[in-house]
Amino acid sequence: MGRSAKLLAVVLRSVDYGERDRVVTLFSRERGKLSAFARGARSSRRRFGGVLEPFTLLSAELTERGGDLWGLEDAAVERGFGNLRGDLARIACASYAVELTRELVRDAEPHEDLFDGLVAYLALLDEGPARPWDLRRFELDALRAAGLQPSLTGCARCGLPPGDGPARFDPLQGGVLCTACGSTGGVGARPISAAVLQALRSLQRGDGVEAGAGEGAEARAILGACIEIHLGKRLQSRRFLDEVGPMLS
């Protein structure tokens, strides 16, 4: 038998395997992302019950099986975030957050800040309504934890301050472009308003944001493009998130 481990982890994904079992993707503070085989999870609710649902925080007992797959021997809910599960907007945000986490990090790479940030964001959703700027903050925190933080205070190309003139955001370059560099920016570069740039900088500093719906939509598009460039695809949960967008407070 391989090594064993007891971890605090968030369920990122749970996939049925055959008629009896499940394979779950977990994200732990100590070991990062890992996959675990839950034998009998479908056929016996006594063993795992509703423990393996996505965005559940659980205590997991695992055993190495060889390769990249662990065996899930036992699991207990630490926090089920039950309040958020009755609201479509909060479900959409939580689903997006766990999928973004799953896609941004590699297996077996600890990201303590991202784990703490994900748990904090799920707790925020559990305790109150889904708010667009809270999700923008999580996106920025997730990008930073993965080493992909966009440059917002200096030009991503030349490094100089963007200045007071019109600025553009180029997701391929990895951030904001000053007026001079923006005039020759790539095809993916888009204008970024001073209000949105200031709001995103405030979020990066951990400060609060007061902005209107127009700025919120612009920030969502900018960070969404940045994430898609880094991942090379559009997240499946993004469509659901866009559909419930008008429901967000």
Where are these regions (language model features)?
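Non-catalytic alpha-helical scaffolds and adjoining flexible linkers that form interface surfaces
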Residues: 1-249
